[in-house]
Design a protein with these regions (language model features):
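Substrate-access "cap/lid" subdomains that shape
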Residues: 1-109
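Mobile gating loops/cap/lid regions near enzyme active sites that modulate substrate access
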Residues: 102-105, 109-197
Length: 197
């Protein structure tokens, strides 16, 4: 998990201030979301890697998340993690080779070294109807939260079926620490990935 230092986070804030031509912190706090979206391409060009993410602030987050998982210093509870098929513009069908999926599987493997609790891995690869963006970042949330009817897209019967299954899986995981019998844990012996197509 890409964890940032406080110095990196403050520099990102400074870069946003400069790119948006804002002079004060007060003005920055009032920056409309649309303005932030407009300057993102310039911000991404200036930065290497992911621009936003968890920050080690020594109050809420006291260490790098990946280090904590690798060294067994995180809550010993079952874990569910996954990817969307076209996150960060990954080409269709290439999600298994993406840096995001690699990060998910490395996290699962590190977690398995220090815990007897299961890790469940998923890939949401359903290409949403309405355009050619595929399974973009956060597109799975409409399905998990059952809010397909609020989306502008013309969802199909298949989408509602996927949503029902995802809601059931997430609910079972929350209630029973297990998302259901058709979803096996990700282990060294069986690298099972539950795919929502």
């Amino acid at each position: 998990i890409h964890t940032r230092t406080m110095k990196q986070a403050l520099q990102t804030g400074s870069d946003i201030r400069v790119l948006s031509k804002i002079k004060t912190v007060s003005d920055m706090r009032r920056l409309p979301a649309q303005k932030l979206v407009e300057i993102l391409p310039a911000l991404y060009e200036k930065k290497e890697g992911l621009t936003f993410g968890p920050v080690v602030d020594d109050h809420i987050l006291c260490e790098n998340i990946s280090d904590a998982v690798k060294e067994g210093r995180c809550a010993d509870v079952p874990m569910m993690i996954g990817v969307t098929g076209n996150d960060l513009s990954v080409e269709d069908g290439a999600w298994r080779k993406s840096m995001i999926f690699e990060g998910v599987t490395k996290l699962a493997e590190a977690r398995n070294q220090h815990s007897s609790k299961p890790v469940y891995v998923y890939a949401f690869t359903r290409k949403l109807p309405g355009d050619d963006r595929g399974a973009f970042h956060s597109s799975d949330l409409w399905y998990v939260f059952g809010t397909l009817s609020r989306c502008w897209r013309k969802m199909e019967r298949r989408d509602y079926s996927i949503s029902y299954t995802m809601i059931r899986n997430w609910t079972d995981f929350i209630k029973n620490d297990n998302p259901g019998k058709e979803w096996r844990a990700y282990t060294d012996e069986e690298k099972f990935v539950r795919q929502y197509i």
